[in-house]
Amino acid sequence: MNKFISIIALCVFSSYANAAFTLNSTRYIYNEGQQSVSVNIHNESEHKYGGQVWIDNIDKNGEVVFFSPSPMVFKLNPKQKQIVRIVNINDNLPKDRESIFWLNVQEIPPAPKGDGGSLSLAINNRVKLIYRPIALKNGRDEAENNIKLINSGTDSCLENTTPYYFAISDVKINGKSIDLNSDAKNKMGVFSPFSKVCLGNVNTSGNITVTAFNDYGVATSYTVQRSK
């Protein structure tokens, strides 16, 4: 009997536990001078959902607003699509490198039916929004080829010598993935322009490659060159 009740409870809990919204991209590039960027949000569920959109600053003063989504709040019927436009309202951003932000699309699930014993989860879809100055518009393709291996004390480090943000998911030496600590993994996922991430005290005498995602979310392997 208890097992049967547990299965029923799990089914009730799971009815709204899966993400309802899907986005048309895993990252959005806002080129300087662009009028807006469109975010297509699709409700994959069988229920009407509310939605809320906002943008968080990653490496800037949290009180300064650079982008405004429209609409910020909306309702979305089952299997329907909502287009949200992101507009740059403050161009006081660096012109010699990219700036990065988090774009948040929060699901607002319908109220559970019944006696209040069931739960619904409000899932937040968070993806990168990258502001690219006009001077950098044409140099992004294959920019990961400019990642260098440098020595910093006893550590070996990867250096991003470019003005672009990289999203690195894996680092390999002679075809074998190395075990990075959580701090290094996080920094690799948002590899800032003109910065370095140290790999620790590892043997880097062999062939070093990184797997990185480009503007379209496609993973590609790149060979890391040693700094001369």
Swiss-Prot record:
Localization terms from the record: Periplasm
UniProt keyword annotation of Disulfide bond present: yes
GO biological process assignments: cell wall organization; chaperone-mediated protein folding
Superkingdom per UniProt: Bacteria
Keywords noted in UniProt: Chaperone, Disulfide bond, Fimbrium biogenesis, Immunoglobulin domain, Periplasm, Plasmid, Signal
InterPro entries: Ig-like_fold, PapD-like_sf, Periplasmic_pilus_chap, Pili_assmbl_chap_C_dom_sf, Pili_assmbl_chaperone_bac, Pili_assmbl_chaperone_C, Pili_assmbl_chaperone_CS, Pili_assmbl_chaperone_N
Covalent S-S links between cysteines: 157-198
GO cellular component terms given for this protein: outer membrane-bounded periplasmic space
Signal peptide, first to last residue: 1-19
NCBIfam families assigned to the protein according to its UniProt record, in alphabetical order: PRK15211.1
Family: Belongs to the periplasmic pilus chaperone family.
Function: Mediates assembly of pili by forming soluble multimeric complexes with pili subunits as an intermediate step in the assembly process. This protein is involved in K99 pili assembly.
PANTHER family assigned: FIMBRIAL CHAPERONE YADV-RELATED, PILUS ASSEMBLY CHAPERONE
Protein name, as recorded: Chaperone protein FanE
Organism: Escherichia coli
